[in-house]
């Protein structure tokens, strides 16, 4: 079911580190005049360890509280959390729909070697992300299935 592009819209940008989430989210933010939520940016601005899962969870909860308020006002919100699990994506989709928002999923993927190269080139992570850590993340990441993708109003799969 295609919903109006003029009403509230939630855009979920999904993928592993180095997949291009921030690049896409910033492009969409500018083009759509959307509000973008990135926990990494907030944690960096607060000089917090981006690997502190407890604080990340609190920041994401706060971002989602603001996001829902903005959706209720009819705005476009971009969630740039990675959303590694289907249950997290389902929760966001269902809550946004309850507010009358259309929901988009943009899944970005790339081979591990490409992800690792991008992560090393940007050099933002402290401590560094090592290849074995990235391989563990690849194992736990739940790739959106065709059945899940069909639940969204609009979707895209972008890869290298």
Regions found by a protein language model. Give the residues of each.
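NTP-dependent small-molecule kinase module
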Residues: 1-6, 31, 139-160
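Walker A (P-loop) ATP-phosphate-binding motif of ABC ATPase nucleotide-binding domains
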Residues: 10
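Hydrophobic anchor at the beta1->P-loop junction of P-loop NTPases
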Residues: 13
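P-loop (Walker A) phosphate-binding loop of NTP-binding proteins
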Residues: 16
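Conserved substrate/cofactor phosphate-moiety recognition/catalytic segment
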Residues: 19-75, 117
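Conserved nucleotide-binding/hydrolysis micro-motifs of P-loop NTPases
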Residues: 41-43, 84, 109-114, 157-159
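Glycine-rich phosphate-binding loop used to anchor ATP phosphates in small-molecule kinases
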Residues: 54-104
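A glycine- and Lys/Arg-enriched "phosphate-lid" helix/loop adjacent to the NTP-binding pocket
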Residues: 97-144
